[in-house]
A protein has these predicted regions:
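N-terminal pre-catalytic "stem/leader" segment of glycosyltransferase-like enzymes
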Residues: 1-65, 365-369
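Catalytic binding pocket for nucleotide-activated donors in carbohydrate/polymer assembly enzymes
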Residues: 225, 269, 278-345
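Short internal beta-strands
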Residues: 30-40, 117-122, 209-213
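Active-site-proximal region of nucleotide-activated glycan assembly enzymes
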Residues: 89-154
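Conserved catalytic-core segment of nucleotide-activated headgroup transferases in glycan assembly
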Residues: 13-25, 150-236, 323, 350, ...
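Extended catalytic core of nucleotide-activated donor transferases of GT-like folds
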Residues: 41-111
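Donor nucleotide-activated moiety binding/catalytic core segment of transferases
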Residues: 61-65, 223-285
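C-terminal alpha-helical cap of glycosyltransferases
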Residues: 332, 346-369
């Protein structure tokens, strides 16, 4: 039996986790979600897990938690109590994060505590090495395992070159747990919305779809206000604004008054606007062209020249939007997304997880640290 351990009170966290089950990465038949009780989120977590028939268990105190039956424990988020769970040495402990990004959160030293760490490809490995999180020895001994697009998430978008009936996607990230990790383009001056409106007008595209990060407004409620005001701004230009449906807990008023809910299975996207976030790599994997907002913090982890050149082409500078195509897109994608072992590429995502469980169960690295 496998476990996914979750110590997080943010409601959006459980939806990010559940998406892996919906996508078929994790199997309800052999994986249990173990989450800590928090008054603010308990009922929501319980309801969502029950809705998708995901085996789960909750606890009040980590000291009373029995983890002896689990062969592998997966972690999507860092938390202090993770350190306590790692003392259960009958299991191997794997940090899979919840998407690949160039945020500072992806290189926190706490990541060293896990037996194994999954990343999407060479970009992730480089991030760890350049920032002293792991060593070449760790890489050579497969403590860091490249699992390609297994855990980066899958969107409901597809690339389309025909502007007719196409959408512009805006996917702002949240404001982060601390100010230094604030990557959101949502702002009081509505800069991102104004930029998108100008692009829509120039491109003669009338449809906008918004997928705001589910944690938007958790640290600072004014970011929900910025989103609200931005939507009204777009609609004032007779643009049709639709909601992906992710951003709806605590903010159903947005859906009710400002947004048209859509039931489409796939959304044809002509152009996407994103922040420094996992959406960048997710859309790149699906060949959807992106422009990226980089706010005043300017703390994206982009050290390799290949990424610097790429960012020069996709970053929105002032009010100027570059129209230059990225010829090296396949090379960029291969840098972000790759595999430690060639056999993984042809496997389905759930088979890759089976492979990972089998691999770490046979390896002894976790017992050396």
């Amino acid at each position: 039996m496998r476990a996914i351990y979750l110590d997080n009170k943010i409601k959006g966290a459980i939806n990010q986790l559940i998406n892996y089950f919906i996508e078929g990465v994790f199997d309800c038949n052999n994986t249990k979600v173990i989450f800590k009780y928090y008054k603010e989120s308990f009922l929501y977590y319980k309801r969502q897990l029950k809705k998708y028939k995901i085996n789960h268990e909750y606890f009040f105190s980590v000291n009373k938690l029995d983890m002896s039956s689990y062969k592998v424990v997966f972690y999507l988020f860092n938390a202090q109590s993770n350190c306590r769970i790692l003392t259960y040495r009958n299991a191997k402990h794997i940090f899979i994060t919840h998407g690949e990004s160039n945020k500072l959160a992806s290189i926190k030293p706490i990541i060293r505590i896990y037996d194994y760490v999954v990343c999407a490809g060479d970009a992730g490995v480089s991030r760890y090495l350049e920032n002293g999180i792991f060593s070449r020895y760790d890489v050579e001994n497969h403590r860091i395992i490249k699992m390609g697009d297994t855990f980066i998430g899958k969107s409901v978008f597809k690339k389309i070159s025909d502007k007719k009936n196409a959408y512009i996607l805006y996917a702002p990230t949240w404001e982060g747990g601390i100010k230094s990790e604030q990557y959101s383009s949502l702002s009081e001056d509505l800069y991102a919305f104004k930029t998108i409106q100008k692009y829509a007008q120039k491109s003669d595209i009338k449809k906008i779809i918004i997928q705001a990060h589910p944690n938007t407004g958790h640290r600072d409620k004014k970011y929900r206000k910025y989103l609200n005001q931005g939507i009204k701004f777009l609609k004032s230009y007779n643009l049709e604004v639709e909601n992906m449906g992710i951003y709806n807990h605590k903010t159903s008023f947005l859906n009710k008054f400002f947004l048209k809910r859509s039931s489409k299975d796939i959304y044809p996207i002509y152009q996407a606007f994103v922040d420094i976030s996992a959406m960048e790599i997710q859309l790149l994997n699906e060949y959807i062209p992106i422009f990226i907002f980089i706010n005043k913090t300017k703390n994206a982890i982009v050290n390799k020249q290949i990424l610097k050149d790429y960012y020069d082409k996709i970053t929105i500078q002032s009010d100027v939007i570059q129209t230059e195509s990225v010829k090296e897109l396949e090379q960029i994608k291969d840098f972000y997304i790759g595999y430690s072992f060639d056999e993984l590429k042809s496997m389905t995502k759930n088979k890759r997880v089976d492979w990972l469980v089998d691999f770490v169960s046979k390896e002894n690295y976790g017992n050396k640290i």
